Design a protein with these regions (language model features):
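Active-site helical microenvironments for divalent-metal-assisted chemistry
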Residues: 1-153
Length: 153
């Protein structure tokens, strides 16, 4: 697991495991807070788009980018690990499927690039404070590799 390998605390790791539960299950933040603790529930809440689910794709993603500008270090770490996992999967799928990869998303390649490069700007704006090889460096490098690969073809 990305957060564990990066040396984050147990609370951050647990929040990383639970980060999609509010969006994808019937579990509530109260349940998470009572079952685990309020710090984990707060991190999970910070990673959730649930309250914005009715907005169009681009508006939801713009909200995510704006929110992450002010989010706690823990929320930023969980979000970065989640997005790093997503981009790594996209890279692997791109190697197998090529341009067909983009057909499976609600938004096409250009919109995905806008979103992921926007996330890089927000999540990786403190790279000089991060050790080489951190999840933030890995995320930036993976996003650049995915979208540079596309442009080179």
């Amino acid at each position: 697991m990305i957060l564990s390998q990066a040396g984050y605390s147990e609370d951050v790791i647990v929040a990383g495991v639970l980060h999609d539960t509010i969006e994808d299950t019937d579990l509530t933040l109260d349940y998470i807070g009572n079952r685990f603790n309020t710090r984990i529930a707060d991190i999970v809440e910070g990673c959730s788009e649930e309250q914005h689910g009715t907005l169009p794709w681009k508006a939801r993603k713009q909200h995510t980018i704006e929110y992450l500008k002010k989010a706690s270090c823990e929320v930023r770490a969980v979000a970065c690990a989640d997005k790093l996992h997503n981009v790594r999967s996209m890279v692997a799928d791109y190697q197998e499927q090529g341009e067909r990869l983009w057909d499976r998303f609600n938004a096409g390649r250009d919109e995905q690039e806008w979103y992921y490069r926007g996330l890089v700007l927000v999540l990786c704006n403190r790279l000089n404070q991060e050790p080489a090889g951190s999840i933030f460096h890995q995320f930036k490098d993976t996003v650049e590799g995915l979208f540079s690969r596309h442009q080179a073809e």
